[in-house]
Amino acid sequence: MNRDELADVRNEMLGFIFQQYNLLPKLNLVENVEVPLMYAGVPRAERRERARIALERVGLGDKLKHKPSQLSGGQQQRASIARALAGEPAVILADEPTGALDSRTGREVLELLQALHAAGHTVVLITHDNSIAVQAQRIIRLEDGWVVYDGLANAPEAVVTPRAAGGKGGGAP
């Protein structure tokens, strides 16, 4: 694939949830959620409606015209999730989505991601927190660029590469 084709795949198939939200401070929530849809060529009226629906879905329907600075960290993260959902992606990539949140708000975000998974989305969650990782169905653990564990979260007998057991190699970098 060339660069334009890869950009189309990213725009149409993937939704990104960033650790630091990456909301544009001068735009309100609807406008923030619209940004990736604008790049996808979605007409303005449809963008607005999809942004509104996505924000309502994450519990921010009453904050549509708020700027990011008017929101709590948890609300900003939910706005980031809405932005990821508005494009109706098959796969959601979440980079440490609870890292900057208090434990209660972090649980709410995880519950939302679990609901998205139950609704048919593939959710790839990157975390350093084992208490979050074990809530997944599958864990792929990396160390120094090597896969050292790939298995079900509740299956301690899952495959561990020889590298993780002290050997050399065996995993995929």
What are these model-predicted stretches?
Residues 146-173:
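Conserved beta-strand-loop-alpha-helix hinge in the C-terminal portion
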